[in-house]
Amino acid sequence: MPPKKQAQAGGSKKAEQKKKEKIIEDKTFGLKNKKGAKQQKFIKAVTHQVKFGQQNPRQVAQSEAEKKLKKDDKKKELQELNELFKPVVAAQKISKGADPKSVVCAFFKQGQCTKGDKCKFSHDLTLERKCEKRSVYIDARDEELEKDTMDNWDEKKLEEVVNKKHGEAEKKKPKTQIVCKHFLEAIENNKYGWFWVCPGGGDICMYRHALPPGFVLKKDKKKEEKEDEISLEDLIERERSALGPNVTKITLESFLAWKKRKRQEKIDKLEQDIERRKADFKAGKALVISGREVFEFRPELVDDDDEEADDTRYTQGTGGDEVDDSVSVNDIDLSLYIPRDVDETGITVASLERFSTYTSEKDENKLSEASGGRAENGERSDLEEDNEGEGQENGAIDAVPVDENLFTGEDLDELEEELNTLDLEE
């Protein structure tokens, strides 16, 4: 009797995968919905440790890249085999009534058609690109009506046409040249094509499915507007070049004269508008006017308001909590706003030697201050000079009191003993 086969120690791959998922779920219980970076990093580390053990993340990424390369190699091999052995092409089917010569032969595309000129399908690979596109400026229903003449009608068809043309339902139906909104939306959103069906009833839609001549779409308008846009600098340069060379130079006098003329034109226009509105108000034409205009057009209303006002006098009590805020008020001097030319007389430019001498003096001062020798070099800071000046003005210089018994002989002896007994580490 042969010995029994030993069961696999590791078990099946599915069982191992379930165990790993169970361990990951137990260790990350309650942390999956946490959005913190630490929790997400911990979950990622636990998942990697359970799935790949102590394997390096670089090795895992390398193994995945190798698997991907193997898949790509297999795909390339299949493509090469298909090109070499030419797989079987399914029989071609076309819809009833369609012209076979308008369809490219599938076997000819693969290079397997042996019929040649006898093949009922077309062998012209450019035929698909030569197909007529559907025009958005022509309604296909109009063409069908033009081709559908009385020569091809029978008695039943004739009755149907008469009922449609002169029937009561057709008379009640409004005739319109309005373009269908669904048709326009489909064109604007690039959804219009051979298989597009109008949501408003398909071929029964009462509105036209063709654009009128000269109609411009919104997307084309936006493109034209973007092309017409120019920058502010280009606009200024274009306007300047259009003025020509014979122009008046702008000076203070010409600018003030232009400003005065514009201001006077504005005042005249405002007065004309007020006179016109006043005439409309008197004639009863102005229905909407402001309260200010009412009192301007009828000043007598101000006196009427004073007569109807309350004559009661109120005395204002002086409270103890009032604070007297004394604020200095300065009158506006209009002479400050008078434009003037810049007076360039008397303006001088400093020479380069002055700047070089000034910088050298500053560098010397900084050097003496850094070396701590201001007293030796006979230099003093601005602060010392100010303090000295203040002291001389007061008539005496305040001396700093010095304690002469601060360092006696006993203190110095104790200091020397401490220095001698101090252990110095090298």
UniProtKB/Swiss-Prot annotation:
Subcellular location: Cytoplasm; Nucleus
SMART domains in the record: ZnF_C3H1
Domain of life according to the entry: Eukaryota
UniProt biased composition (Basic and acidic residues): 13-29, 64-74
GO annotation, biological process: cytokine-mediated signaling pathway; cytoplasmic translation
GO CC terms: cytosol; nucleus
Acidic residues: bias regions: 382-391
Any coiled-coil regions, as ranges: 61-86, 218-285
Bias type Polar residues, positions: 53-62
Family per similarity comment: Belongs to the ZC3H15/TMA46 family.
Name of this chain's protein: Zinc finger CCCH domain-containing protein 15
Organism of this sequence: Bos taurus (Bovine)
Gene: ZC3H15
